[in-house]
Amino acid sequence: MFTIETKQMDIIIENVCNEKAKDLFYQMLINYEIYKTMAEMLDENMKKLNFYNFAKTQTCHMNDGLFGELEYAEYQFVYQMKVIGNLIVLITSAHRIMTCIKQARANEKCKDWRIVSEEIEKCDKIFDNKLRNFMEHLEEKVYKQEVTNQNCHFSPQRILYCKDEKTDKQFDFNNEQLKMIDNLIDNILKMLSARKEKRGNLSHMEC
């Protein structure tokens, strides 16, 4: 039932010597499960939101009546809130994943990390502190009525726009873009698996 997850855990157990790094890899996998769940929910909720956006533009009083139009507007609002909630959790979990990865690399100091260094840098620029902080404090800003469509909104094309005194950022949450985290973790696990073949070369692993 949990074949993939079990295999991922085994790779870490068998190929990571540094105990602190091992704990960080476990935390990475926990946050990755959250990330994957949010990515699926986000995709589903965006599809529903776009459906109701389209339905509202096509409605008319003759067929649906005033209450039909209001019903579509309510669905729009509900799914907008769901998408924002999904984005907050997804971005936070991705930032935690990147933090775990960078700290694990710092603890291990292994040369094989060079294989994924460019991927780490690219993902780190996307899921940076500014984006994470903006989304984490979004609920508070909404409560204080400090957020408008100019500060935070997203498009049907799945682009999130964030702007305040500290942040001016666009975040692409299309499925292909979100797979960057999947690809990074997959390549890190491949990197760890390759250590089994090089176990005799202690200078390579430095552990």
Model feature map: region roles:
Residues 1-124, 154-207:
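Amphipathic alpha-helical interface segments
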